[in-house]
Amino acid sequence: MSGNNLKMEILDLISSRQEGSYWDFKQEHHKNTANLLHDIICMANNPLCNQDGYIIYGVSDKTWQIIGIENDSSRRNQEHIISQLKSKSFAAGIRPIVRLITLHINEHEIDVLVIKNTMDTPYYLTSDFRDKQRVVRANHIYTRVSDVNTDIDKSADKHIVEALWKKHFGLNLNPFDRLKLLLADKSNWETSEDQHYNKICPEFTLCLEDDDDNGLYPEFY
Protein backbone atom coordinates (compact mmCIF):
# COMPACT_ATOMS: atom_id res chain seq x y z
CA MET A 1 0.00 0.00 0.00
CA SER A 2 1.32 3.45 -0.93
CA GLY A 3 1.82 6.16 1.67
CA ASN A 4 -1.08 8.20 0.30
CA ASN A 5 -3.45 5.22 0.37
CA LEU A 6 -2.42 4.41 3.94
CA LYS A 7 -2.91 8.04 4.95
CA MET A 8 -6.44 8.06 3.51
CA GLU A 9 -7.26 4.79 5.28
CA ILE A 10 -5.96 6.07 8.62
CA LEU A 11 -7.96 9.30 8.22
CA ASP A 12 -11.08 7.21 7.57
CA LEU A 13 -10.41 5.17 10.72
CA ILE A 14 -9.94 8.33 12.79
CA SER A 15 -13.19 9.72 11.36
CA SER A 16 -15.01 6.57 12.47
CA ARG A 17 -14.40 7.66 16.08
CA GLN A 18 -14.04 4.09 17.26
CA GLU A 19 -11.53 1.26 17.49
CA GLY A 20 -12.01 -2.01 15.66
CA SER A 21 -10.78 -5.53 15.04
CA TYR A 22 -7.67 -4.44 13.13
CA TRP A 23 -6.92 -0.94 14.40
CA ASP A 24 -6.10 0.55 17.79
CA PHE A 25 -5.37 4.16 18.78
CA LYS A 26 -2.66 5.18 21.25
CA GLN A 27 -2.06 8.74 22.41
CA GLU A 28 1.64 7.96 22.80
CA HIS A 29 4.09 5.12 22.24
CA HIS A 30 4.18 2.24 24.71
CA LYS A 31 6.32 2.98 27.75
CA ASN A 32 6.19 -0.67 28.83
CA THR A 33 7.71 -3.24 26.44
CA ALA A 34 5.50 -6.07 27.72
CA ASN A 35 2.43 -4.01 26.83
CA LEU A 36 3.88 -3.35 23.36
CA LEU A 37 4.60 -7.05 22.82
CA HIS A 38 1.13 -8.03 24.03
CA ASP A 39 -0.57 -5.55 21.69
CA ILE A 40 1.48 -6.71 18.68
CA ILE A 41 0.71 -10.39 19.32
CA CYS A 42 -3.00 -9.66 19.78
CA MET A 43 -3.11 -7.78 16.49
CA ALA A 44 -1.09 -10.45 14.64
CA ASN A 45 -3.40 -13.22 15.93
CA ASN A 46 -6.56 -11.90 14.30
CA PRO A 47 -8.60 -14.94 13.22
CA LEU A 48 -11.48 -13.13 11.56
CA CYS A 49 -9.99 -10.16 9.73
CA ASN A 50 -8.00 -10.93 6.60
CA GLN A 51 -5.92 -7.76 6.49
CA ASP A 52 -2.98 -6.00 8.14
CA GLY A 53 -3.44 -4.57 11.62
CA TYR A 54 -2.64 -1.00 12.70
CA ILE A 55 -1.51 0.43 16.02
CA ILE A 56 -1.87 4.18 15.48
CA TYR A 57 0.21 6.41 17.75
CA GLY A 58 -0.59 10.08 18.27
CA VAL A 59 -4.39 9.89 18.34
CA SER A 60 -6.45 10.02 21.54
CA ASP A 61 -8.61 6.92 22.05
CA LYS A 62 -11.05 9.04 24.06
CA THR A 63 -11.63 12.11 21.88
CA TRP A 64 -10.14 10.86 18.56
CA GLN A 65 -8.16 14.09 18.41
CA ILE A 66 -4.86 14.02 16.49
CA ILE A 67 -2.26 14.93 19.12
CA GLY A 68 0.92 13.82 17.37
CA ILE A 69 3.99 12.06 18.71
CA GLU A 70 6.66 14.56 17.69
CA ASN A 71 7.25 15.40 21.37
CA ASP A 72 6.70 11.89 22.72
CA SER A 73 9.62 10.97 24.99
CA SER A 74 8.69 7.26 24.70
CA ARG A 75 8.76 7.26 20.90
CA ARG A 76 10.34 4.13 19.38
CA ASN A 77 11.66 3.59 15.88
CA GLN A 78 11.20 0.56 13.66
CA GLU A 79 14.65 -0.84 14.41
CA HIS A 80 13.97 -0.81 18.15
CA ILE A 81 10.58 -2.53 17.81
CA ILE A 82 11.96 -5.25 15.51
CA SER A 83 14.90 -5.75 17.87
CA GLN A 84 12.47 -6.29 20.74
CA LEU A 85 10.61 -8.93 18.74
CA LYS A 86 13.81 -10.69 17.69
CA SER A 87 15.02 -10.98 21.28
CA LYS A 88 11.86 -12.76 22.48
CA SER A 89 11.31 -16.53 22.48
CA PHE A 90 8.56 -17.10 19.94
CA ALA A 91 7.32 -20.60 19.12
CA ALA A 92 9.27 -22.10 16.18
CA GLY A 93 11.21 -18.82 15.98
CA ILE A 94 8.42 -17.26 13.90
CA ARG A 95 7.67 -13.66 14.84
CA PRO A 96 5.09 -11.09 13.74
CA ILE A 97 6.20 -8.98 10.78
CA VAL A 98 5.93 -5.26 11.49
CA ARG A 99 6.67 -1.97 9.80
CA LEU A 100 6.58 1.52 11.34
CA ILE A 101 5.39 4.33 9.06
CA THR A 102 5.27 8.03 9.95
CA LEU A 103 2.44 10.10 8.48
CA HIS A 104 2.04 13.88 8.55
CA ILE A 105 -1.54 14.89 9.30
CA ASN A 106 -2.86 18.29 10.42
CA GLU A 107 0.68 19.58 11.07
CA HIS A 108 1.37 16.62 13.35
CA GLU A 109 3.33 13.40 13.03
CA ILE A 110 1.57 10.15 13.78
CA ASP A 111 3.25 6.74 13.72
CA VAL A 112 1.43 3.73 12.31
CA LEU A 113 2.77 0.34 13.36
CA VAL A 114 1.63 -2.03 10.61
CA ILE A 115 1.35 -5.67 11.71
CA LYS A 116 1.30 -7.88 8.62
CA ASN A 117 -1.49 -10.37 8.08
CA THR A 118 0.08 -13.83 7.62
CA MET A 119 -0.83 -17.52 7.86
CA ASP A 120 1.78 -18.14 10.58
CA THR A 121 -0.79 -17.91 13.36
CA PRO A 122 -0.96 -18.44 16.22
CA TYR A 123 2.01 -16.41 17.42
CA TYR A 124 2.96 -17.05 21.05
CA LEU A 125 5.96 -17.04 23.38
CA THR A 126 7.67 -20.13 24.77
CA SER A 127 9.00 -18.31 27.84
CA ASP A 128 7.59 -15.49 29.95
CA PHE A 129 8.60 -11.90 29.27
CA ARG A 130 8.30 -9.40 32.10
CA ASP A 131 8.62 -5.64 32.17
CA LYS A 132 7.94 -4.29 35.66
CA GLN A 133 4.59 -5.76 36.77
CA ARG A 134 3.40 -6.75 33.30
CA VAL A 135 4.06 -10.30 32.09
CA VAL A 136 3.47 -11.73 28.62
CA ARG A 137 3.01 -15.38 29.48
CA ALA A 138 4.52 -18.40 27.77
CA ASN A 139 2.19 -20.66 25.78
CA HIS A 140 -0.68 -18.20 26.08
CA ILE A 141 -2.57 -17.38 22.88
CA TYR A 142 -3.46 -13.68 22.76
CA THR A 143 -5.83 -12.38 20.12
CA ARG A 144 -8.11 -9.48 19.25
CA VAL A 145 -11.85 -9.85 18.75
CA SER A 146 -13.78 -6.76 17.71
CA ASP A 147 -11.93 -3.98 19.58
CA VAL A 148 -10.95 -6.07 22.61
CA ASN A 149 -7.59 -7.75 23.26
CA THR A 150 -7.21 -10.94 25.28
CA ASP A 151 -6.19 -9.99 28.82
CA ILE A 152 -2.45 -10.36 29.36
CA ASP A 153 -2.99 -12.89 32.17
CA LYS A 154 -5.44 -15.04 30.16
CA SER A 155 -5.51 -17.07 26.96
CA ALA A 156 -7.97 -16.91 24.08
CA ASP A 157 -11.08 -19.08 24.06
CA LYS A 158 -10.83 -22.53 22.48
CA HIS A 159 -12.86 -21.67 19.37
CA ILE A 160 -10.61 -18.68 18.66
CA VAL A 161 -7.47 -20.82 18.96
CA GLU A 162 -9.04 -23.34 16.58
CA ALA A 163 -9.76 -20.53 14.10
CA LEU A 164 -6.11 -19.42 14.23
CA TRP A 165 -4.89 -22.95 13.45
CA LYS A 166 -7.40 -23.21 10.59
CA LYS A 167 -5.94 -19.99 9.22
CA HIS A 168 -2.44 -21.46 9.62
CA PHE A 169 -3.31 -24.51 7.50
CA GLY A 170 -5.48 -22.65 5.01
CA LEU A 171 -8.63 -24.46 6.15
CA ASN A 172 -10.54 -21.18 6.18
CA LEU A 173 -9.90 -20.58 2.46
CA ASN A 174 -12.35 -21.31 -0.32
CA PRO A 175 -11.48 -24.46 -2.34
CA PHE A 176 -9.87 -22.57 -5.23
CA ASP A 177 -7.58 -20.47 -3.00
CA ARG A 178 -6.74 -23.56 -0.96
CA LEU A 179 -5.76 -25.42 -4.14
CA LYS A 180 -3.42 -22.57 -5.10
CA LEU A 181 -1.82 -22.82 -1.67
CA LEU A 182 -1.33 -26.58 -1.99
CA LEU A 183 0.13 -26.25 -5.49
CA ALA A 184 2.85 -23.98 -4.09
CA ASP A 185 4.54 -27.05 -2.53
CA LYS A 186 5.19 -29.68 -5.19
CA SER A 187 6.82 -32.04 -2.66
CA ASN A 188 3.43 -32.87 -1.16
CA TRP A 189 2.01 -34.19 -4.42
CA GLU A 190 2.07 -37.82 -5.58
CA THR A 191 1.71 -39.07 -9.14
CA SER A 192 -0.44 -42.05 -10.05
CA GLU A 193 -0.78 -42.83 -13.76
CA ASP A 194 -2.54 -39.84 -15.30
CA GLN A 195 -3.37 -37.96 -12.14
CA HIS A 196 -1.75 -36.18 -9.20
CA TYR A 197 -3.13 -36.04 -5.68
CA ASN A 198 -2.07 -34.11 -2.61
CA LYS A 199 -0.65 -36.31 0.16
CA ILE A 200 -1.95 -34.06 2.93
CA CYS A 201 -5.33 -33.34 1.36
CA PRO A 202 -6.03 -36.22 -1.07
CA GLU A 203 -9.43 -34.80 -1.91
CA PHE A 204 -7.50 -32.38 -4.13
CA THR A 205 -6.70 -34.35 -7.30
CA LEU A 206 -5.49 -33.18 -10.71
CA CYS A 207 -6.38 -35.28 -13.74
CA LEU A 208 -4.27 -34.73 -16.86
CA GLU A 209 -5.13 -35.41 -20.47
CA ASP A 210 -2.81 -35.55 -23.47
CA ASP A 211 -3.33 -32.91 -26.10
CA ASP A 212 -3.26 -35.16 -29.18
CA ASP A 213 -4.14 -32.32 -31.53
CA ASN A 214 -0.84 -30.48 -31.20
CA GLY A 215 1.45 -33.20 -29.90
CA LEU A 216 1.90 -31.56 -26.49
CA TYR A 217 2.10 -33.60 -23.31
CA PRO A 218 1.32 -32.43 -19.80
CA GLU A 219 4.00 -31.71 -17.25
CA PHE A 220 3.25 -31.27 -13.57
CA TYR A 221 4.97 -28.23 -12.09
Tell me what each language-model feature is.
Residues 106-139, 145-171:
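Catalytic "initiation/cleavage/transfer" segments centered on a nucleophilic residue
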Residues 24-26, 101, 114, 142-144:
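Residues in well-ordered beta-strands of folded domains
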Residues 13-16, 46-47, 101-105, 132-134:
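A general structural signal for short secondary-structure junctions and capping/turn motifs
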Residues 1-67, 71-80, 87-94, 146-221:
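Bergerat-fold GHKL/Histidine-kinase-like ATPase
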Residues 53, 66-131:
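Divalent-cation
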